[in-house]
Amino acid sequence: MEFSVKSGSPEKQRSACIVVGVFEPRRLSPVAEQLDKISDGYISSLLRRGDLEGKPGQMLLLHQVPGVLSERVLLVGCGKERELGERQYKEIIQKTINTLNETGSMEAVCFLTELHVKGRDTYWKVRQAVEATKDGLYTFDQFKSVKPETRRPLRKLVFNVPTRRELNLGEKAITHGLAIASGVKACKDLGNMPPNIANPAYLASQARRLADDYETITTKIIGEQEMEKLGMSSYLAVGRGSKNESMMSIIEYKGHPDSEAKPIVLVGKGLTFDSGGISLKPGEGMDEMKYDMCGAASVFGTMKALAKLNLPVNVIGVLAGCENMPGSNAYRPGDILTTMSGQTVEVLNTDAEGRLVLCDALTYVERFEPDCVVDVATLTGACVIALGHHITGVLSNHNPLAHELVNASEQSSDRAWRLPMADEYHEQLKSPFADMANIGGRPGGTITAACFLSKFAKKYNWAHLDIAGTAWKSGAAKGSTGRPVSMLVQFLLNRSGQETEE
């Protein structure tokens, strides 16, 4: 699909469709007013008859509007003008795109990017429109024997900006939005893949393919034999019950002018299926445990977006691939594991396995002498209880890094919120037999999980993103969300000095 920006009057647009907004109650947006004037009040007369109230997401497709060069005009309900916020704006864009796609408008000029969204500029509106468009048109149907086809799908979308001086900003927003959308799609595709296909070896194959596609990327795969030599006993223990070999994929992107500049390291939990192991999960909903690798999928998607943007920064992405299954060789509650760092862990629950994989991955990345490390993981159900399905949890040992990530989440509208990590929570991890236990009980489960990880991240600035509530959706809209790719790319845009705000 082709995107572009322009600055022009609606009456001069010769397109299959023009998209303009209508506010409640039946009040035309400034652009719609221009079309109404040209058409001698044709549009306002329809509104007076009650054809469109202007409620959020309402659509009215008009044909052959008098005086308008475009074949069609799509009126889009935008709700009350003063209440138009970020979420509503993105939902309106998605509904608009779906309507255009379903009604055979193969190209359109969209004036919704001229609407006033509280606290947001043209760059944000255009970029979010691109991301929302791609998100709304996303499908995962490769395993369906009969694939649905759109007869005349939307192929070209032009976003109008208020002034010509904003054209460069709009073009930058499209470039960024397309790269991020590409990363989000890659993340979704990996997450939605069935676990009989998307095992650790599949993750590794995708990492290799990324290196084949981009000159700035190199990939290294670490299998169980090398992990054994490295002393990654905790990581290896989790995968012992599965016939699928554990594999850690190291994706290195070098874009900084100084190739020796310290890298930012992203570590993704890649449990391609988590049965819970010996501490078996309930059967209901267990199919969704294929999404336990969404941390790794989001790191993969971020690396892809990064390569597309060719940002001047060095980044290393780690996909910690593993499968947690019960079996005669599976690790057990009561086992004591010696981690790569030399610290010992008493296993009280084999379903708290993500931290046992991540702790060795966090120790491994010390060798890169990182500028900072951010791990991403569907780690705790407690985070879903604390923050629901809308906001990602952030925990960190470094205040400036935590602030950077939360700020990036605000800029990208991929929301995150910082949770505390006080010393008192470490008390819950004490073990009478080892240096620590792998769980700390029900109270503050997200925090104690982060406290566990922090014991392996003392040699660098570190942050942990718990995406257990935000990585996928259940129910009718079941599927990977592609989060937090947008937030991570924004973080890297900021780190590389890219200006994304007016």
Curated annotation (Swiss-Prot):
This protein's name: Probable cytosol aminopeptidase
Catalytic reaction(s) noted: Release of an N-terminal amino acid, Xaa-|-Yaa-, in which Xaa is preferably Leu, but may be other amino acids including Pro although not Arg or Lys, and Yaa may be Pro. Amino acid amides and methyl esters are also readily hydrolyzed, but rates on arylamides are exceedingly low; Release of an N-terminal amino acid, preferentially leucine, but not glutamic or aspartic acids
Localisation: Cytoplasm
Cited NCBIfam families: PRK00913.1-1, PRK00913.1-2, PRK00913.1-4
PANTHER family: CYTOSOL AMINOPEPTIDASE (PTHR11963:SF23), LEUCINE AMINOPEPTIDASE-RELATED (PTHR11963)
Repeat found in the keyword field: no
Biological-process GO terms, alphabetical: proteolysis
Required cofactor names: Mn(2+)
InterPro entries per the UniProt record, alphabetical: Leucine_aapep/pepB (IPR011356), Macro_dom-like (IPR043472), Peptidase_M17_C (IPR000819), Peptidase_M17_leu_NH2_pept (IPR023042), Peptidase_M17_N (IPR008283)
Active site: 281, 355
Keyword Heme: no
Co-factor binding details: Binds 2 manganese ions per subunit.
Role played: Presumably involved in the processing and regular turnover of intracellular proteins. Catalyzes the removal of unsubstituted N-terminal amino acids from various peptides.
EC number: 3.4.11.1, 3.4.11.10
Family designation: Belongs to the peptidase M17 family.
Alphabetical keyword list: Aminopeptidase, Cytoplasm, Hydrolase, Manganese, Metal-binding, Protease
GO molecular function, one term: metalloaminopeptidase activity
Chief place where the protein resides: cytoplasm
Pfam families noted in UniProt: Peptidase_M17, Peptidase_M17_N
Domain of life where this protein originates: Bacteria
Record CDD domains: Peptidase_M17
Binding site residues for Mn(2+) 2: 269, 274, 292, 353
Lineage: Bacteria, Pseudomonadati, Pseudomonadota, Gammaproteobacteria, Vibrionales
Gene symbol of the encoding locus: pepA
GO cellular component terms listed in the entry, alphabetical order: cytoplasm
Organism whose genome encodes this protein: Vibrio vulnificus (strain YJ016)
Binding residues annotated for Mn(2+) 1, in chain numbering: 274, 351, 353
